Amino acid sequence: VFGLTAQFAEENPNTVLALTKALIRAAIWLDENDNANRAEAVEILARPEYVGADAAVIANSMTGTFEYEAGDKRAAPDFNVFFRYNATFPYYSDAVWYLTQMRRWGQIAEDKADGWYDETAKSVYKPELYKAAAEAVIADGNAKAEMFDFDADGYREPTAEFIDGVTYDGKTPNAYIDSLTIGLKTGQTVSGGAVN
């Protein structure tokens, strides 16, 4: 996750464009050729001036295999995805999902209308900045247009691909929250650590 304040973005549009271009290019590099560059990324990240952790530990999640416990290594090419599946695109529906989890677990103590989730997501996620950077990366010859979801309205299609199998539609967050078996529901509030 990479975020900037609205003030910084407004005052530094060229820097924001350059940063976003760099993040897109790095994400493409990490995922291209079946993750072929991940071993080099692991070595870079292991350096003391960056993460400074043991390269073998970083490699566990970065190189397409994961060791769940001693001796239990499994192929997991999508354990970390940086660019595939439009992973870098700032979908409003992703922001709305985070907000639904905050509401579900009481970090947002009171009901919010579906429109509040949409407005909040749109106040933070800026696909127009991302699209401008993607177009610049394409113009620079470092990507192809078909690699990007330029037609996106900011919302992914409804999906039931989460671990619980519950269908999530970012355009109907309250229906999603109410469909979950545990967590706060419509009409419930949190006050003084108690659910009312």
Q: PLM features: residue spans?
A:
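Pocket-lining segment of extracytoplasmic ligand-binding domains
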Residues: 1-66
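Segments of small-molecule ligand-sensing domains
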Residues: 49-196
